[in-house]
Design a protein with these regions (language model features):
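Conserved GNAT-fold acetyl-CoA-binding loop/helix
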Residues: 29-54
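A short beta-loop-alpha structural element at the N-terminal edge
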Residues: 12-26
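Conserved beta-strand in the GNAT
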Residues: 66, 72-83, 87, 97, ...
Length: 173
């Protein structure tokens, strides 16, 4: 549990349980709907169902965390531990890809995502590097990741005409 001194909110994370899949799916859909409406990209998490969340819980390629604020589920964080990412052919030992972090829309912009990311990182004791990508025109995402210690790699990937992904990383020493 981490207390945000500014707002005095109790924030915690833990490994996601299967019975949380539906609630997390609903939060994910609500959080990613505006991005789907803007970009209309087929990879948007808004398009994924409850089975997608449940399947990732049972895979050694992923680690899923549930975010709690004052005991209530407010979001999720998904890390990829093995395999391909948009910017890396194959994750190496100690590299982790922050595939998505999402928060209930009414709880966004309260540093919950940033704090949850920092809490999740403690769950990877062998981590050398964390990677994340996001649409480069989303300034609130950029600020969130920068405040969590990520830096811009300068790499970009044109996913479709109106969607360019920016790659950020956090190297641990």
């Amino acid at each position: 549990i981490l207390q945000n001194k500014k707002d005095w909110l109790a924030l915690s994370i833990r490994a996601t349980k299967e019975n949380e899949s539906l609630e997390l799916c609903n939060i994910q859909k609500a959080a990613f709907l505006p991005l789907y409406e803007k970009y209309r990209d087929e990879g948007n998490p808004y398009l994924r169902g409850v089975e997608d969340v449940a399947n990732r819980l049972n895979s050694d390629y992923f680690r899923y965390f549930t975010i709690f604020l004052d005991g209530e589920i407010v979001g999720g964080v998904l890390y990829k531990c093995k395999g391909r990412t948009p910017f890396i052919e194959n994750l190496e030992e100690g590299q982790y890809y922050l595939q998505r972090v999402y928060i209930k829309p009414e709880q966004q912009c309260k540093r919950i995502a940033q704090t949850a990311i920092l809490l999740c990182e403690k769950e990877f004791p062998n981590a050398k590097c964390f990677l994340v990508d996001f649409p480069e025109d989303l300034m609130k995402n950029k600020r969130c990741y920068e405040q969590a210690g990520f830096v811009d790699t300068g790499k970009r990937l044109q996913e479709q005409p109106n969607l360019v992904l920016a790659c950020f990383e956090k190297i641990l020493t």
